[in-house]
Amino acid sequence: MKKFLSFIVMCLATVTLAMAQQAKPKTGGPSIKFEKTTHDFGTFSETKSTQKCVFTFTNVGKSPLIINQAIGSCGCTIPTYTKAPIRPGEKGEIKVTYNGRGLYPGHFKKMVTVRTNGDPSMVRLYIEGEMTDAAQDSATKEKK
């Protein structure tokens, strides 16, 4: 019984130590750096429900950077991105379109998840804004 308990304790200690090891950062590979990771559209009318922005990034690594995918958090957030490999020192873009047509007016915050072959391998970009009700906008115009 003592041997069995000693074996279990040793296994738990080994697993604990193995999980505590930190991953070494990649060196010499591609590395992505965004100029900004959040864009605020501000306030806009429901009648102009489609809004666009561009996130610019640079490959600050030493080998070509590939964007494997960029996925919006919902169907209203549509990213398009540079498909060709980005050489070291060069820039690329991720264009994001928000389409609020048919959605409820108010504040929104959406996310685009970008996956690359570089470091970091995943980056989250955020868009947000305030879409006002079209009926409320027309009532405001009539009062003027």
Mark where each language-model region is:
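Surface-exposed binding patches on compact interaction domains or structured appendages
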Residues: K62-E93
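Short, acidic/polar linear motifs in exposed loop/turn regions
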Residues: V60-S63, G102, G118
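Bacterial Sec-dependent N-terminal signal peptides
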Residues: M1-A23
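Short, solvent-exposed beta-strand/turn "edge" segments of beta-rich domains on protein surfaces
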Residues: G42-S49, P85-R87, R101-G102
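Buried hydrophobic-core signal for structured, non-transmembrane domains
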Residues: M19, C53-N59, V96, K110-R115
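Terminal connector regions
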Residues: Y104-D133
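Short, hydrophobic beta-strand segments
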Residues: I94-G102
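Beta-sheet-dominated interaction scaffolds and their linkers
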Residues: Q21-T56, V60, M131-K144
